[in-house]
């Protein structure tokens, strides 16, 4: 919290100046996601004038992709899940979103090989399968966006608001794989 306070002072803002508080909910580091969400909950409890906006790391990568590529049929977002696995979510040009999945590298490669149309691939997990898909002519690969940038999230939220699209305000982590502690107990 001291870091947040320092940034607010530096920007000459108070919490009363804020309309929205945006936070990412994952998937990602279990501890990092939990700390971010807990901090957001604390601020939102203290300041009722602020509205919560939750953006997944999939949505973040998807938004970065559509700002770079306009002609596509589907966008595949791959996030590194480690242990030779990826988190994957597919966004269709029509607006349909498939449910996020935990997959292995082979599944991703086979699925992309069978795809037709113009397919965009992006996300931190793309590097794990890149050498296996780089020669597929229907695949457009975008560089991974190593860090989530606050300004991109703000731009995404502004875009959503301008289109009257309902924003996610559920301050809850996006779990696709159970936390290690849970798997150990089971």
UniProtKB/Swiss-Prot annotation:
UniProt cross-references to InterPro entries, sorted A to Z: ATPase_NBD, Gcp-like_dom, T6A_TsaB
Signal peptide limits: none
Source taxon at top rank: Bacteria
Alphabetical GO biological process terms: tRNA threonylcarbamoyladenosine modification
Name of the protein in question: Uncharacterized protein RP551
Source organism (scientific name): Rickettsia prowazekii (strain Madrid E)
């Amino acid at each position: 919290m001291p870091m947040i306070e320092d940034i607010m002072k530096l920007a000459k803002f108070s919490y009363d100046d804020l309309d929205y508080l945006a936070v990412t909910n994952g998937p990602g580091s279990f501890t990092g996601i939990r700390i971010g969400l807990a901090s957001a909950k604390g601020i939102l409890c203290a300041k009722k004038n602020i509205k919560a906006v939750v953006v997944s790391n999939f949505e973040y990568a998807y938004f970065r992709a559509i700002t770079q590529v306009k002609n596509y049929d589907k966008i595949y977002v791959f996030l590194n899940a480690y242990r030779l696995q990826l988190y994957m979510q597919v966004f269709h040009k029509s607006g349909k979103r498939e449910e996020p999945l935990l997959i292995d590298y082979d599944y991703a490669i086979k699925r992309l090989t069978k795809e037709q149309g113009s397919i965009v691939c992006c996300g931190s997990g793309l590097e794990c399968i890149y050498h296996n898909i780089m020669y597929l002519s229907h695949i457009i690969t975008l560089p991974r966006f190593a860090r989530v940038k606050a300004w991109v999230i703000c731009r995404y939220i502004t875009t959503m608001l301008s289109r009257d699209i309902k924003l996610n305000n559920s301050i809850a982590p996006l779990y696709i794989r159970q936390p290690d502690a849970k798997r150990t107990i089971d």
